Curated annotation (Swiss-Prot):
Name of the protein in its database record: Glucose-6-phosphate isomerase, cytosolic
Enzymatic reactions: alpha-D-glucose 6-phosphate = beta-D-fructose 6-phosphate
SUPFAM superfamilies: SIS domain
Substitution effect: residue 73 to A: In strain: cv. Bl-1 and cv. In-0
Length: 560
């Protein structure tokens, strides 16, 4: 299907929603929430998950109009094109097939006419075999000791996604048992402090390093890889590198040149974007080393269950589609630029940072997929913290400052339940009391009249008034197992894609990260010249020159 040069904002469906905004401005969530039929229609269940979006500033009519917008944007066709392996990442001429990474063995998903699923499972089987060897102790380090500690080196999607999943599983009873005696750490930043923190307390003799870089040229990752190679070599000799370092890469020549056995390189493909790569060897290898492949396979099955739901469910009952349309409504029509992701689960503390990248790198675009400047805003500013920590941090602004739509994520069954004798409720019930209360506090607020009835002094009434009418949605998961973690990941991945499909942008490239890299190269050359030859900074503006001079004059870096 050829792309259309028309912008979505030129369609009747978009204009209809623009006019509808005036109707919504006349409503308040206090009134909308009193309509039980409306609320019931805004609850969706799938596979034990419950989505409640009744606290969105939307009516049944709004949802009908958003579904018309989906039709106008050719959303059905765009989803099909993604699953069919068409090159929907047009600026890089690539398919977008992260769904193939978690597809069942008998599935058929094609890229350039070839079924990629067998290739995916070849890598998964190789990961299972390798991780079993490491975990069983049949593969040992250079001094004959088992490798019980893993450092995964990667940046961006090679780090944020796997870290989110690792953190979510750390306290799951089954995962906890399977990881007994093992450690998994992630090294991302080129700041030497990150290196120091990662190797602190570790013995090179028992450490395996996983270097994640598709091209094996990523500047930050390769500098950290060389640093850890030096750490291993200094302790165990150069020959130990092949026993203590493996790669996730497709550049076997550079892998071998680095000192890693190419047989210990695990592939992934051009049709996997970095921020969508957690289900590839990028995430599956380090997670399998920590928890065992069978645990990670449950995670993949959870993600796959949402893939199938997304592909086959009518839009009015399709969780990622509904979430994506509501985000478009909040950003492009109601004018809310941000979104708070608020999981009431400490195990999900790294979820918001991961989705921040998935969302903002995907949809932070200013032109259409055809290169036309967009006359409307796309993307959201995503941030978040687990509840109840966030309540004591930034909820003040959410309640009485700017309006920020919120995603509340709750878990029915705690990974680590605690009930203290004499307490009114369990620790988890105390947490969930806040999960249920906060959305209503945002929706209903508190009026001056209510405060007067409570005999609040007149001078405090303006300060204690809550306007309410602040949108949120609630997603309730039955528990937080590897399967549920996979579901949660896929829901948000597809939600982000839906937003991009509707806006008519390319959610799968990231040219915005390139310019800074180019400028950093110029600075790097200057620093080298200044350190080795004493040359003064030149060719920069006054501000950068002044900053560079101060840095060079006062830094304690050794002369090279």
């Amino acid at each position: 299907m050829a792309s259309s040069t028309a912008l979505i904002c030129d369609t009747e469906a978009w204009k209809d929603l623009k006019g509808h905004v005036e109707d919504i401005k006349k409503t308040h969530l206090r009134d909308l929430m009193s309509d039980a039929n409306r609320c019931q229609s805004m609850m969706m269940e799938f596979d034990g998950l419950l989505l409640d979006y009744s606290r969105q500033r939307a009516t049944v009519e709004t949802m009908d109009k958003l579904l018309n917008l989906a039709k106008a944007s050719q959303l059905t066709e765009k989803i099909s094109r993604m699953f069919n392996g068409e090159h929907i990442n047009s600026t890089e001429n690539r398919s977008v097939l992260h769904v193939a990474l978690r597809a069942p063995k008998d599935a058929v998903i094609k890229a350039d006419g070839m079924n990629v699923v067998p290739e995916v499972w070849n890598v998964l089987d190789k990961i299972k075999e390798f991780s079993d060897k490491i975990r069983s102790g049949s593969w040992v380090g250079a001094t004959g000791k088992p490798l019980k500690d893993v450092i995964a080196i990667g940046i961006g999607g090679s780090f944020l996604g796997p870290l989110f999943v690792h953190t979510a599983l750390q306290t799951d009873p089954e995962a906890l048992e399977s990881a007994k005696g093992r450690q998994l750490r992630f090294l991302a930043n080129i700041d030497p402090v990150d290196v120091a923190r990662n190797i602190s307390g570790l013995n090179p003799e028992t450490t395996l390093v996983v270097v994640v870089s598709k091209t094996f040229t990523t500047a930050e990752t390769m500098l950290n890889a060389r640093t850890l190679r030096e750490w291993i070599t200094a302790a165990l000799g150069a020959s130990a590198v092949a026993k203590h370092m493996v790669a996730v890469s497709t550049n076997l020549a550079l892998v071998e040149k680095f000192g890693i056995d190419p047989n210990n390189a695990f592939a992934f493909w051009d049709w996997v974007g970095g921020r969508y790569s957690v289900c590839s060897a990028v995430g599956v290898l380090p997670l399998s080393l920590q928890y065992g492949f069978s645990m990670v396979e449950k995670f993949l099955k959870g993600a796959s269950s949402i893939d199938q739901h997304f592909q086959s469910t009518p839009f009015e009952k399709n969780i990622p589609v509904l979430l994506g349309l509501l985000s478009v409504w909040n950003v492009s029509f109601l004018g809310y630029p941000a979104r708070a992701i608020l999981p009431y689960s400490q195990a999900l503390e790294k979820f918001a940072p991961h989705i921040q990248q998935v969302s903002m790198e995907s949809n932070g675009k200013g032109v259409s997929i055809d290169g036309l400047p967009l006359p409307f805003e796309t993307g959201e500013i995503d941030f978040g913290e687990p509840g109840t920590n966030g309540q004591h941090s930034f909820y003040q602004l959410i309640h009485q400052g700017r309006v920020i739509p919120c995603d509340f994520i709750g878990i029915v069954k705690s990974q680590q339940p605690v009930y203290l004798k004499g307490e009114v409720v369990s620790n988890h019930d105390e947490l969930m009391s806040n999960f249920f209360a906060q959305p209503d506090a945002l929706a209903y607020g508190k009026t001056p009249e209510q405060l007067q009835k409570e005999n609040v002094s007149e001078n405090l009434i303006p300060h204690k008034t809550f306007s309410g009418n602040r949108p949120s949605l609630s997603l309730l998961l039955p528990e937080l197992t590897a399967y549920n973690v996979g579901q949660l990941l896929a829901i948000y991945e597809h939600r982000v894609a839906v937003q991009g499909f509707v806006w008519g942008i390319n959610s799968f490239d990231q040219w915005g990260v390139e310019l800074g890299k180019v400028l950093a190269t110029q600075v790097r050359k200057q620093l080298h010249s200044s350190r080795t030859q004493g040359t003064a900074p030149e060719g920069f503006n006054y501000s950068t020159t002044t900053l560079l001079k101060r840095y060079l004059e006062t830094s304690s870096e050794p002369q090279m």
